[in-house]
């Protein structure tokens, strides 16, 4: 990223703090947030906290306005968090506000658009998630420890644009070779997605973003990566 490592970084819901601590060691100025003091326990993360050298702001609810001024950060990290929220709408809007012009968001979340997840949903009606679905045994206040809101990329694509951000790249996290045979369906996915995005081009609300959406939906990482690892940039203006 431009200016790295001389960046002001915010790691939202930092968990045990591995990312925040690594960026701090690289020379970034890093803050992190926790929703509850036991966040990292609820989400089944093991091992010691690594946030001793990082300022952690407690009790930060990502459903509410964030307590930071406009353009306060050059980089915001939202790693394996969005799927735990009832909706990503408020936090994406706030990220757009607190990012400086030219700043970046790095977001990762389970990729329900990958072909394996689509195949699983077609036959079972359930998304292929990394963690089990929230069960009846959970207290309502602990629901956020599970993947209660799998992220729909077309909606995320729109939310980012509304917040003043534009997707710059998608990267692979993990590709499972046992699912490689599903790539045989790529031509069918291409044709279906092209028809779907062209169908909306005559709609004034959708016309501006449909071609860009198609481009990202057909990226190899979108179709085969276990996680969606996305970098988006806030416009300079």
Q: Which residues are covered by each model-predicted region?
A:
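Glycine-rich helix-loop-beta junction characteristic of Rossmann-like nucleotide cofactor-binding loops
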Residues: 1-4, 66
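Residues at the starts of beta-strands that form the adenosine-phosphate
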Residues: 8, 29-31, 166
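A short acidic, Gly/Pro-enriched loop at the edge of an enzyme's catalytic core
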Residues: 63-76
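A short SAM/SAH-binding and catalytic strip from SAM-dependent methyltransferases
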Residues: 75-86
């Amino acid at each position: 990223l431009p200016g790295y490592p001389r960046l002001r970084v915010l790691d939202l819901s930092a968990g045990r703090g591995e990312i925040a601590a690594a960026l701090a060691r690289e020379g970034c100025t890093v803050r992190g947030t926790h929703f509850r003091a036991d966040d990292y326990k609820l989400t089944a993360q093991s091992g010691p906290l690594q946030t001793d050298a990082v300022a952690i702001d407690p009790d930060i609810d990502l459903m509410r306005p964030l307590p930071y001024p406009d353009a306060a950060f050059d980089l915001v990290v939202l790693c394996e968090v969005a799927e735990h929220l009832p909706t990503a709408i408020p936090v994406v809007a706030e990220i757009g506000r607190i990012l400086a012009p030219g700043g970046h968001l790095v977001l990762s979340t389970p990729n329900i658009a990958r072909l394996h997840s689509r195949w699983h949903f077609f036959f079972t009606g359930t998304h292929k998630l990394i963690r089990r679905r929230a069960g009846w045994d959970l207290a309502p206040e602990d629901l956020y420890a599970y993947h209660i809101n799998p992220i729909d990329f077309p909606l995320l694509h729109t939310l980012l644009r509304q917040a003043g951000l534009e997707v710059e790249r998608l990267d692979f996290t993990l590709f499972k070779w046992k699912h490689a045979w599903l790539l045989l369906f790529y031509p069918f996915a291409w044709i279906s997605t092209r028809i779907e995005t062209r169908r909306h081009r005559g709609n004034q609300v959708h016309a501006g973003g449909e071609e860009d959406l198609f481009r990202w939906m057909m990226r190899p990482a979108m179709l085969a990566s276990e996680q969606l690892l996305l970098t988006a940039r806030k416009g300079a203006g």
